[in-house]
Curated annotation (Swiss-Prot):
It catalyses: L-glutaminyl-[peptide chain release factor] + S-adenosyl-L-methionine = N(5)-methyl-L-glutaminyl-[peptide chain release factor] + S-adenosyl-L-homocysteine + H(+). It is an enzyme of class 2 (transferase). GO terms for biological process: methylation; translational termination. It holds the Pfam family MTS. Methylates the class 1 translation termination release factors RF1/PrfA and RF2/PrfB on the glutamine residue of the universally conserved GGQ motif. This is Release factor glutamine methyltransferase. Its EC number is 2.1.1.297. Belongs to the protein N5-glutamine methyltransferase family. PrmC subfamily. Substrate binds at N190, P191, P192, Y193. S-adenosyl-L-methionine binds at G125, V126, G127, S128, G129, E148, N190. The keyword S-adenosyl-L-methionine applies. It comes from Geobacter sulfurreducens (strain ATCC 51573 / DSM 12127 / PCA). The keyword Transferase applies. InterPro entries: DNA_methylase_N6_adenine_CS, HemK-like, N5-glutamine_MTase, PrmC_N, RF_methyltr_PrmC, SAM-dependent_MTases_sf, Small_mtfrase_dom.
């Protein structure tokens, strides 16, 4: 007699995948399993449980295996699914850009709180476009400009701007280089801020998959602040704000840069974990 082929129901695949990903060191293995299987099967997460006992056909199993194998190699879930939510908007993400973090929403919140009438906004290092697009959606009458060195990131930011109907003008280049004599009421930036020596200790998802150029901030993580902060006043209108995201333990040093450059009303803002995540100041 020939043995009957093993039947894999959604319940069985969920249980097996959850354990497998946990063994591979994936945090939140249960939740990520649900997202992966939802994507593979074209169901929402409720649909998985409604169809708990549904047997999967070979094509469905192959689709599940393909996504699970990628995650088991610690490829970020966001790259596998192709999107990440930020400020209530879904952004397309690829390995050409840093994955938007919820901590970065703090800089958007502070910008809207402190510069709600900004008519000209600049995002330095636009990446996926998440900050620029989020601000453009909340400041529909503002001229929002983004600068980015990576051609791949520029293309993706343009795609995300179009996806959300946001008016964002993008320039390829380094920092302030492409801007000529333009001036702004608000400049924001989430520059690379991880010290080079710390990169190897990052989680595999970050170390192996996200673009190193978007992470590496030089020997002490502060290289880009030394370039951005002193140059920013030349590109700010009177009363204009500069706000930057930063890493753990960097706020005091960056605040010093702001003060020495002549910024006033300097502040720090914390992320949901109580970590100083944004430093900002205003040109008088």
């Amino acid at each position: 007699m020939t043995e009957k082929p093993e039947i894999w129901t959604i319940r069985k695949v969920l249980d097996w995948t959850r354990g497998y990903l946990a063994e591979k060191g994936v945090e939140n293995a249960r939740l990520e399993t649900e997202w992966l299987l939802s994507a593979a099967l074209g169901l929402d997460r409720v649909g998985l449980y409604v169809n708990f006992d549904k047997p999967l056909n070979p094509e469905e199993l192959a689709a599940c295996r393909g996504l699970v194998a990628r995650r088991a190699k610690r490829e970020p879930l966001q790259y596998i699914l192709g999107t990440q939510e930020f400020c209530g908007l879904d952004f397309v993400v690829t390995p050409s850009v840093l994955i938007p973090r919820h901590d970065t929403e703090v800089i958007v919140e502070e910008a809207l709180r402190r510069a709600p009438h900004a008519a000209a906004v600049l995002d330095i290092g636009v990446g996926s476009g998440c900050i620029a697009v989020a601000l453009a959606k909340q400041l529909p009458h503002a001229q929002v400009v983004g600068v980015e060195q990576s051609p791949g990131a520029i293309a993706l930011a343009q795609r995300n701007a179009e996806r959300h109907g946001a008016r964002v003008t993008l320039f390829e280049g380094s920092l302030f280089e492409p801007l000529g004599d333009q001036r702004f009421d608000l400049i924001v930036s989430n520059p690379p801020y991880i010290p080079t020596a710390d990169l190897e200790a990052l989680q595999p998802e970050v170390r192996e998959y996200e673009p190193r150029a978007a992470l590496d901030g030089g020997s002490d993580g502060l290289d880009f602040y030394r370039l951005i902060v002193p140059a920013a006043p030349e590109y700010l209108n009177p009363g204009g704000w500069l706000m930057v995201e930063l890493g753990i333990g960097q706020a005091e040093t960056v605040l010093g840069m702001f003060s020495r450059t002549g910024f006033c009303d300097c502040f720090t803002a914390q992320d949901p974990n109580g970590i100083d995540r944004v430093v900002g100041g205003r040109i008088g």
